Amino acid sequence: MSTQYSILFKQEHAHEDAIWSVGWGKNSNDGSELVISGSLDDLVKVWKWSDERLELQSTLEGHQLGVVSVDVSPSGNIMASSSLDAHIRLWDLESGKQIRAIDAGPVDAWSVAFSPDSQHLATGSHVGKVNIFGVETGKKEYSLDTRGKFILSIAYSPDGKYLASGAIDGIINIFDIATGKLLHTLEGHAMPIRSLTFSPDSQLLVTASDDGYIKIYEVQHASLAATLSGHGSWVLNVAFSPDDTHFVSSSSDKSVKVWDVSARTCVHTFLDHQDQVWGVKYNKNGSKIVSVADDQEIHVYDCPI
């Protein structure tokens, strides 16, 4: 049990190019934690966390261009990656084998996100549509139309009720998944929304933008609860802690920041990366944070619980 924030491990030269996306998974055989990284070197790598360090478990080859987004299914056994080659690939985390490839259409897959029941996979598109694919079939089942600009970021609410999308013009849309209806349009940012994340209780939506601000919205009434500043440049990623109390952000200012949700304050700043930090994620129990950056490194941090 840790009482303070500290860096546990640095994996240098983790990839041959910038690392833009990261996730946590689990090995169902021995219960060990896995870190999944996606890079502009076209590769997805699966790392095993053991003895306070990362060990490369498998390298997943198949994408023809850089990997821009990875997500692990809530069920924990499947991983999805999307690439600049306009393909989404589904992988078996255990074996490292590709389950299927989905052609998302010309330049049409950016970020990918699994639904809470692991049955669907959502991806944003250039024409302002969120496309929903069946995980079992690999077929497009339906689309949610924002009638807006290129969608950079998407997130499901953990209760399965909502899907939020963030566009390149700073507009955020929240859809009701059951009806497919657009519920709310939020115009709090004037620049691209790089990332958004719902709180585990699905009550709050946190958004990250190139305008340097993080905003917290109360989902039900679509009201702005807070605007947080602290990063010196684009905010590239945000992720919630599993216990609802904190979230983490990363930025092109090379920092990773941990925020207290109720106090609306930054409680710790990590300055260990040498370049812009594209991805951050809490592990399942909130004891660790992983970050990835343009410096080709993966960092794992210890969090007080």
UniProtKB/Swiss-Prot annotation:
Subunit annotation: Component of the PAF1 complex. Component of the SKI complex.
Assigned protein family: Belongs to the SKI8 family.
Organism this protein belongs to: Xenopus tropicalis
Keyword Nucleus: yes
Coiled-coil ranges (or none): none
Function noted in UniProt: Component of the PAF1 complex (PAF1C) which has multiple functions during transcription by RNA polymerase II and is implicated in regulation of development and maintenance of embryonic stem cell pluripotency. PAF1C associates with RNA polymerase II through interaction with POLR2A CTD non-phosphorylated and 'Ser-2'- and 'Ser-5'-phosphorylated forms and is involved in transcriptional elongation, acting both independently and synergistically with TCEA1 and in cooperation with the DSIF complex and HTATSF1.
UniProt WD repeat ranges: 14-57, 62-101, 104-143, 146-187, 188-227, 230-269, 272-305
Domain of life: Eukaryota
The protein's name in its UniProt record: Superkiller complex protein 8
InterPro entries, alphabetized: Beta-prop_EML-like_2nd, G-protein_beta_WD-40_rep, SKI8, WD40/YVTN_repeat-like_dom_sf, WD40_repeat_CS, WD40_repeat_dom_sf, WD40_rpt
CDD domains: WD40 (cd00200)
Alphabetical keyword list: Cytoplasm, Nucleus, Repeat, WD repeat
GO terms for cellular component: Cdc73/Paf1 complex; cytoplasm; euchromatin; nucleus; Ski complex
Subcellular location: Nucleus; Cytoplasm
GO biological process: nuclear-transcribed mRNA catabolic process, 3'-5' exonucleolytic nonsense-mediated decay; rescue of stalled ribosome; transcription elongation by RNA polymerase II
